[in-house]
Amino acid sequence: MFPVIFSANFFELHTLWVFFAIALIVATIALIRLSLANGLKVQFISSNAWKIIFWGLIGARIWSIINNYSSYFSEINFSNFLRLFYFWDKGLELWGAIIAATIYFYLLCKKNEQNFWKWLDVLVPSTIIGLAIGGIGTFFDGTNYGTPSSLPWAVNFDNSAIKFSVPIHPTQIYTFLYSSIIFTALLFIGQNPKVKQMEKSGLVGLIGIASFCFLHFLEEFVRGDDALTIFDIRIPQIAAFIATMGALIVIYRRFRKKRSRLHSK
């Protein structure tokens, strides 16, 4: 569509990176406001932000390398080895970033005696609105595209990197739409007095994870870009299913116990 905003000599300004920067700014603003509203110290995040981002990037890169191993390991040589560290080639994967950043943040909370579940309630909505904006960036960049479609809103991309020359599902816009809806819904849920009173809640964050991952699982059925598969099932789809079920199980176990205590009283 419109992958490069500006190009001159040895410099190119990619639309994707511009929207990623906007997504980071908006997500940060949302995080600060939600943290203050929930009585959490923003300093904990600000003092560890670059560490969280660093491990997120490492995870995103590792997942991308695994997902596109044939591109990096077609030949074993020093040039291909250096390519493993080319973070600027847009070889970053969402699931790797989420998994690595979440694991690191959980360990960080334990080390600093922070309430992981309360932080989850503000981090998940903030991340989801960032992903919504990032979806617009991938649309202009022509990545994360869909399969051929005859639906009225199907889009024909003029991009040599896309393997289809016919109209395809604008899956990036799907991501933007359902992420925006989930973010809005989570804000309303978080304002519910009963949810606010829950000790060590985590309910908002877990609902956000379950709903986003479930809709991403459905999106994977119409994704047309290349991805590593197991038994012809895309690994990102498997990851989305596991994350959905994991979040639902945690919701059931945590909040069933809370209801049982209330009834026993």
Predicted features, each with a name:
Residues 1-265:
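A feature for loop-to-transmembrane-helix boundaries and adjacent hydrophobic helices
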